[in-house]
């Protein structure tokens, strides 16, 4: 389908440096390195304290593994979290802290990894997320995870979470700071490793796919880069025009990295949003 997303006014005349900067969250947030280091430290401690169901393989790749944090009840809802890094950076272990608030609130949590570009194409990455969900449906109960699944993800993981709403196992999604139209990414330096093809852009841009009539909350930080904010707003408007459920949630004062705290804290607005997605799914 034709994408309802359009590039910014004058995009064709932008320099390559300007296009790259439009999606460069690390440079766009002054203290990004400190925030990442803090998240990694918190995640290392959390993971060490919850080591019972880690490194569970769902595929043959080294990164194709789950870390599961089961609730006291196997039938508790499960929040799946998919990490970001523009499909080419980061690892699931450094996002373990994302389970803290949900686990305290009675959810189970699953954090899955996936093979990164350039080793994996976008097509392979999307397939790995679907394989991870298939594994969770088949084997999660053996690890105490058998409840309804809400898929969540941040940045590139927001893109993957939006696509993860399609499989039957998943009742809804929380997409945070995501990319929903891939075409502009192909015109930035991020594509040096992604090597996106026109067919992949068409097939794996959530905004071009048939609208999923499940609740998908779409969140972003109010202080994100303009293009990240716009991607979220356009995707939400596209879904709303198709009467698809799900809130648009700009998180006040949050940049691209600080927005994660709204999910990992038990009183966070995005953890509440995940609960609202679950309730809306019925």
State what each model feature region is.
Residues 76-85:
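Short beta-strand element of the alpha/beta-hydrolase
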Residues 172-175, 187, 196-237:
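The feature captures the conserved acid-bearing segment of alpha/beta-hydrolase catalytic domains
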Residues 219, 229, 233-236, 240-282:
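C-terminal catalytic histidine-bearing segment of alpha/beta-hydrolase fold enzymes
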Residues 86, 114-118, 180, 255:
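Alpha/beta-hydrolase active-site loop signature
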Residues 18, 22-73:
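N-terminal cap/lid segment of alpha/beta-hydrolase-fold proteins
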Residues 131-193, 201:
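Primarily recognizes the serine-hydrolase "nucleophile elbow" in alpha/beta-hydrolase
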Residues 82, 176, 251-254:
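Alpha/beta-hydrolase
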Residues 90-99, 110-148, 262-265:
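Catalytic nucleophile-loop/oxyanion-hole region of alpha/beta-hydrolase
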